[in-house]
Amino acid sequence: MPRERQKRGRRAEAKRKRDDEVGDRTAPKRQKASEGDNDFNPLHSQAKIGDDYIPLEEEPASSMDTPFYGLLDPDEQEYFSHASGLLELNQFETEEEKSIFIERVYEEADGKELKIACSQSCSRLMEKLISASTVSQIKSLFNKFVGQFLNLVQHRFASHCCESLFLRAAPYVTLEMKKKSAEKNDNEGEDSSANLRLEDLFLAVLSELEGNWGYLLTERFASHTIRVLLLILAGEQLDNPSKATVIASRKKENLDKPKVTQRDKSASDRRAVPPSFNAALEKMMNDLVTGLDNTYLRALATHPVGNPVLQVLLSVELTHLGKSKARDPDSVFRRLVPDENLEEGSESAAFIKGLFYDPVGSRLLETMVQLAPGKFFKTFYKALVQERIGSLSRNEIAGHVVARILERLSKEDLKSSMDLILPEVLSLVKRSRFTVIKTLIERGVIRGVDLRPLADSLLLAFGTDPIARINNVLKLHHLNEENDDTKRSSKNSTPEQLHGSLLAQTMLKAPGPLSELIQSSLLAVTLETLIAIAKDPVASHVLQDALTLPTSTIQFRRQITSRFSGKMAELALDSSGSHVVDAVWSATENLIFIKQRFAEELLANERPLRDSFVGRAVWKNWSMDLYKRRRGHWIAVAKGLESVNPSNSENRQPPKSNLDLARARFAEKSNTSTPKKITATF
């Protein structure tokens, strides 16, 4: 092993010398590459390159400048890898046992934190430790990293540890604000790291990174950390699923799943943050873009690394700094779109039109459409979208922006936009591009727009034959081919099948002809196809919604549920079909005879159901133990008159009739009426 490290060192040293020798020749080549950009060629050549101006193609400085914190020896690697496996299994009997184990791992890692964070095999352990650490352990680890954050956030593995540390520490900053006086008395006998405030530690990180924002903005690892810091300073709810793609890339494994329930849940959308965070946020945002000219800032819109940071900057600016900030000529929003009128041929109009069709830039445009002030959105819609919304919806990339635009339209504008999109429905269906159609249905239901013209267009596009129609929507021909081979999973489904299932679910939520298109198709398919749909992890959601949504009439539920007779046990033993069986319970609330017949079928297959994990879940959800022992009570539960728990059902009363409700209203009215005053005579 020492010999191998020696060889790597010699090769790296030789490479560094070669880079130094040809350094003068590489700079013009990079300048030439940046000048070759067709969009920004003239302005790039005129720009004065300063410390914060970094060409998009430029690589970071030599890796020899990055400090080396050392390697773990084989025994240490084995120990920490074993500890990582135990944390992954999470088979501790009590939380106290787990806390003791984590404390022992921290003791073993004392002095080796930087080595572990930079280790390919052990950095995951650090992330898992952070996700289960107490506030004192978080402060101690934070203190160990202080002074090294500039290098850690640029490291391939340590950057993930920094993100986990920041995300874990953010809720405790809010708690510290509420317990300032209490902590002063409680921490008198603790070590110095416990006396540190997380607020001060976060500010120390910002001061350490200050002066390097221009480079870190497009650094592929540090850019994630910048996004996290911006959201923390702004007080965003970090466990919000909508922030998941903003915080981390799609390739990052979701190691934080168990800690979502541990975080402090707040009823409001924003966390309370100290006043120092607000000042630090404004300073950080100014420093990020101060050294960048407008040309470079717009180039970030199509940069795969800089674009997500620009999205966060824009969203924080428009949501936390006030809508008036958008009128500031020095704001990020106005520097991207300086023209208010967006006239044809203007610089801003050309920039926005280019974002429509760019796979990276369109995401920034979606953010602008969602958060822009109403005055700008109206100008933007009338000048660049209103007449072109039909052609824009045809494009695979621009269609996502159109969906965001439809979410902000009024009823009249939505109706006129639908009229322009209807001629494109046939081509959209052929290409399985359902995003615009799905959003049009959702917004039409909310705004109260008549969706019958859209239903007619979908009927022509998918076919008048109900069986062929459901095949075209859910791509059932792929389903039938794979049904005879291996067991399918949602990961094996194609994007066309997923989008088709989502479209069908959206259609079922719309009352009237749209939901009837799917319901009639489900009734027309053969029993084998219906069971295949129920067992498919993607298509089964359509069947579940068809059984439970308010748009399904009692006649439809009676017809569709009766088709499952003789197949309930088979579905209950399937991972996807078991959810359909649970939906049948809700669908047959007013169909007690059908529900009893299905319960008898499940009772006849008690042993296989109890031996299966999903079968036991169905057995419990159908209250089959109650069905075996107290049939009368089960019938009351099946009708919704009583709960499964007898203690809760004692106070439960049957629903009142219309006559009882009228009597109650009359009695309430009599009690609230003011009595007549009777004057006493003496």
Swiss-Prot record:
UniProt keyword Nucleus, yes or no: yes
Record's keyword annotation contains Repeat: yes
UniProt xrefs under Pfam families: PUF_NOP9
Protein keywords: Nucleus, Repeat, Ribosome biogenesis, rRNA processing
Biased composition (Basic and acidic residues): 16-35, 250-272
GO molecular function ontology, one term from the record: RNA binding
Domain of life from the UniProt record: Eukaryota
Residue windows of the Pumilio repeats: 108-143, 347-382, 383-419, 524-562, 563-600
Entry GO CC: 90S preribosome; nucleolus; preribosome, small subunit precursor
Subcellular compartments: Nucleus, Nucleolus
Family membership: Belongs to the NOP9 family.
Listed name of the protein: Nucleolar protein 9
Gene field: NOP9
